[in-house]
Amino acid sequence: MSFVVVIPARYASTRLPGKPLADIHGKPMVQHVVEKALQSGADRVIVATDDERVHSALASFAEQAGVEVCMTSQDHQSGTERLAEVCRHYGFSADTIVVNVQGDEPLIPPAIIRQVADNLAAASAPMATLSVPIQDAEEAFNPNAVKVVTDKEGYALYFSRACIPWDRDRFAASDRAAGSHEQIGDHYQRHIGIYAYRAGFIQRYVDWAPSVLEQVEALEQLRVLWYGEKIHVAQALQAPPVGVDTQADLDKVRALLAN
């Protein structure tokens, strides 16, 4: 099964400037992500960046590894818009499966990159993603942990920062479960931010106006459900380790790779 991995690598970052080039044991962070993507069995791996410094830092490695680096606009409002530009630039056919792997996930398991591509190929949906089980009530009530509920076929019904589904019998009396490490039912799933798309759908997606729900929740994927399309969701074969948003995250990743 053929698929392409696109890795958006935007240089500017409020919390960690120059994040794609952050050094992790002698390599820029984005190179670690590229290496994971290459191990997934992707036919092509493309880094989409808005900064010549990223392009230059990867040039030698990319040439040796057969990786492409695509310069994109600095004006995109989202990673999906950057992805759409890449699809137009390379002229991907409408049925091409494109996996969007974030450039700040240097520890992402290659197996789940392949998994989300395979899932999309088998699904009656233009988009697929993954989830992992939520471990306890503290995570379920954490607004930074995005929850997802699906139908019996594995298609998303809704994504939310709120605790969904709401366990009426457990939570109705009070919110005492918030902040608790009490175990929670296995029907609670946390969404993880890896997506596979059919290339023809990406352009439709970015042409749609933002939806009310995505603006309320600050969750871009809700636009897809708002306009009546499906998102396939499966439980990830492996839970991905921490991504990098802050200096503390970067320090954790360096420590993990050192071991």
Swiss-Prot record:
One of its GO terms (cellular component) is cytosol. Its main location: cytoplasm. The keyword Transferase applies. Its EC number is 2.7.7.38. Pathway: Nucleotide-sugar biosynthesis; CMP-3-deoxy-D-manno-octulosonate biosynthesis; CMP-3-deoxy-D-manno-octulosonate from 3-deoxy-D-manno-octulosonate and CTP: step 1/1; Bacterial outer membrane biogenesis; lipopolysaccharide biosynthesis. It comes from the Bacteria. InterPro entries: Cytidylyl_trans, KdsB, Nucleotide-diphossugar_trans. Pfam families: CTP_transf_3 (PF02348). GO terms for biological process: CMP-keto-3-deoxy-D-manno-octulosonic acid biosynthetic process; lipopolysaccharide biosynthetic process. It catalyses: 3-deoxy-alpha-D-manno-oct-2-ulosonate + CTP = CMP-3-deoxy-beta-D-manno-octulosonate + diphosphate. It is found in: Cytoplasm. The keyword rRNA-binding does not apply. GO terms for molecular function: 3-deoxy-manno-octulosonate cytidylyltransferase activity. Disulfide bonds: none annotated. Keywords: Cytoplasm, Lipopolysaccharide biosynthesis, Nucleotidyltransferase, Transferase. Activates KDO (a required 8-carbon sugar) for incorporation into bacterial lipopolysaccharide in Gram-negative bacteria. Belongs to the KdsB family. This is 3-deoxy-manno-octulosonate cytidylyltransferase. It comes from Aeromonas salmonicida (strain A449). The lineage of its organism: Bacteria, Pseudomonadati, Pseudomonadota, Gammaproteobacteria, Aeromonadales. The gene is kdsB.
